[in-house]
Amino acid sequence: MIWFKNLMMYQLQCPLEKDSSELEKKLANFAFIPCGPQEKVRVGWIPPMVSHKDTLSYQVNRQILLCAHKEEKMLPASVIKQELESQIEKLEAQQKRKLKKTEKASLKDHVFYDLLPRAFSRFQKTWIWIDTIHQMMILDASSTKRAEEALALLRQSLGSLAVVPFTFKHPVEFILTEWIRSDNLPSGFVLMEEAELKSTLTEGGTIRCKNQNLYSDEIALHIKSGKKVTRLALEWQESIQLILNQDLSLKRVKFLEVLREKNSHINKKEVAQCFDADFVLMTYELTELIKNMMSAFSRYPE
C-alpha cells in the first residue's frame, strides 16, 4: 500500500456516486491506455490494488481509493533543436536558399513527431482518497498542477465534480504565526524545528530555518518585524510528522513506526489483507489529523 506523502485537500460540495458498480463503469470508460507512437501524453485509471486487476476503485468503510496513471513521452528541447538544425541545414543546401519562418515551423512539427516514437516515457501515479463520510477528497500530490490533472480526469470520468479547497476566516499563515508567537498550539500537535517565515512587504525577505528553536528570541524578532509563518513542521499525536503550508497542503508526511506497528501482526505475504489493514489505518489516522487541524483553524478567535 502506498502511504500518502503529500496531501492536497479538498471539500466535496456534492456527494459522489454511491453505487460502486456505476462508479466502476464510469472509471472504466477512462481506463489507462499506453501512449501510441504519435501520442505525447496519456492519462487514465489503473487498479489501486495490483492483485485486483479488474477493479479501478478500492472501497472499504465508505472510503474510496483511486489511482490516476500518467504516461508522458520525454523529448528534450536540445534533442529537437539539434535535429531541426540538421534538417534545416540539409534542406537549405539542397534547395540553395534560406527556409522561410513558416517552413521552419512546419519542419519543427515534422521533426517532433518523427522523434516521438523513439522518446522514452515517464510514468507518474497520483492517488486519490475520497472520504464519503466527511465529504473530503485527499490527493497524494506534490503540486497543485498535478492534483488538478487528476481532478480533471475524475471530473471527466464522472461528468461533473464539485470540489473546493478548505477555507477559513483567518489566513493560515496568520494562525501559524500566532501558534508560535503565543506558544499555544492546538491539542495533539507538537512544534518541530523547521519553518519558513516571509515578510508581508513586497520587497521583504524570506527566512528558512532547520534545527532551530522556533520559540527563540531570534524567531520572535522576525515575527515582531512583520514576518508571517508560511511553512511549519509539526508532529501530531506522536504518530505523524508533517510540514503544514499556508495553502493547507501537507508535505513530507511521515507515518512513524509506532503507528505502522499497529499492523505488524499481519503476515506480509497476505498482500490483500495488508493492503486493506494499512489503508484503513492510514485513512483513520489522517481523518483524525485533518479533523483536529480543521477544528483548530475554524475555532480560532478574533
From Swiss-Prot:
Keywords: Cytoplasm, DNA recombination. It is found in: Cytoplasm, Nucleoid. Pfam families: RdgC (PF04381). Transmembrane segments: none annotated. GO terms for cellular component: bacterial nucleoid; cytoplasm. One of its GO terms (molecular function) is double-stranded DNA binding. One of its GO terms (biological process) is regulation of DNA recombination. May be involved in recombination. Belongs to the RdgC family. This is Recombination-associated protein RdgC. The lineage of its organism: Bacteria, Pseudomonadati, Pseudomonadota, Gammaproteobacteria, Enterobacterales.
